[in-house]
């Protein structure tokens, strides 16, 4: 196994992650609206992303995570 581990996200995970923002907190209803899914689906996806450490407890994206040239599936922590 070579290289760093990168989380593999489903299309729904990627849409919900794009709907979150590092600057301010959004409700599950707003995230669901932006991601094109129901609020309860967005909430369960946010919980799954929180377990994977891709979103904070308040639903915000961590400040130092940036999208890379590989797209929405791969996120890297920048030093």
What are these regions (language model features)?
Residues 1-16, 41-44, 63, 73:
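Short alpha-helical segments that sit at the start of domains
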Residues 18-22:
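Short, locally clustered residues in the helix-turn-helix/winged-helix DNA-binding domain
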Residues 24-34:
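Short acidic, hydrophobic short linear motifs in intrinsically disordered regions
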Residues 27, 66-68:
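Residues that mark the N-terminal boundary/hinge immediately upstream of a DNA-recognition element
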Residues 36-51, 62:
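Short amphipathic alpha-helical interaction segments
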Residues 59-65:
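Short, Lys/Arg-rich nucleic-acid/phosphate-binding segment
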Residues 69-79:
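Short, amphipathic alpha-helical interaction segments positioned at domain boundaries
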């Amino acid at each position: 196994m070579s290289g760093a581990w990168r989380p593999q996200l489903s299309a729904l995970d990627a849409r919900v992650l794009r709907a979150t923002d590092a600057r301010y907190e959004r409700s599950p209803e707003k995230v669901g609206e932006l991601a094109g899914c129901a609020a309860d689906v967005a909430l369960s996806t946010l919980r799954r992303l929180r377990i994977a450490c891709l979103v904070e407890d308040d639903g915000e994206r961590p400040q130092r995570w940036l999208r890379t040239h590989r797209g929405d599936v791969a996120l890297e922590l920048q030093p």
